[in-house]
A protein has these predicted regions:
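N-terminal phosphate-binding loop and adjacent alpha-helix
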Residues: 23-54
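Small-residue (GG/TT-enriched) beta-loop-alpha framework at ligand/catalytic clefts
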Residues: 1-26, 56-58, 88-90, 115-180
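Generic alpha-helical secondary structure
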Residues: 37, 41-45, 84-88, 130, ...
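Hydrophobic beta-strand segments of well-ordered beta-sheets in folded domains
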Residues: 60-64
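Internal amphipathic helical hairpin motif
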Residues: 25, 41, 66-124, 162
């Protein structure tokens, strides 16, 4: 979703490969999104429903993209033998040290592997997104009546995410990002 359009990519998983079945977009005729936040929820819901009601989209789960400008990321190096709870606390502490609070941000992290030259450590990418942006997308998935399988950062790792095995057999990827 850009300020004036919604894009849909319908993918089908075939083994380890994702096959693109359909790529389409609809112009909205007005502003529906500004700085990653949905400004006209009803119009967006109607457009998304019309896209998802097309042939081939029945039963597809959603993967919604979060605009990169709504994300904050930090690369951290943590002890490899730390427990996931310890890593989570370290991620929260590091993000808090940069002024990112858990009250107004959703936080997550992704393990990236050992850093070069230090196999006893683990690199992680700590990511925080505005709760308003996340809640917008959760509400949109609920409004169109589709299960949400992920919220992926657009342009940062959406292509890599699409290559991974996390997608169900079929998924409709609604791009919620900035205008081209």
């Amino acid at each position: 979703m850009a300020t004036d359009r919604v894009r849909l990519a319908l993918l089908r998983r075939s083994g380890r490969r994702a096959q693109l079945l359909k790529l389409t977009q609809r112009l909205t005729g007005g502003v529906i999104c500004r700085d990653g936040q949905i400004t006209d929820f009803e119009a967006l819901t109607l457009i998304c429903r019309s896209l998802l009601d097309e042939a081939g989209c029945q039963g597809a789960a959603l993967a919604l993209a979060v605009p990169v400008q709504g994300l904050t990321g930090r690369r951290l190096v943590l002890p490899a033998d730390s427990h996931p709870v310890q890593r989570w606390r370290q991620v929260q502490s590091e993000l808090a040290a940069h002024g990112i609070g858990a009250d107004d941000h959703a936080m997550d992290y992704r393990e990236l592997g050992p850093p070069p030259g230090s196999p006893s450590d683990q690199q992680v990418l700590a990511v925080a997104a505005s709760r308003l942006i996340i809640e917008d997308r959760l509400s949109l998935a609920a409004a169109v009546g589709r299960p949400l399988v992920t919220l992926a950062p657009e342009d940062l790792c959406l292509a890599a995410w699409l290559r991974e095995d996390r997608l169900p057999g079929e998924a409709a990827v609604l791009r919620l990002d900035r205008a081209p």
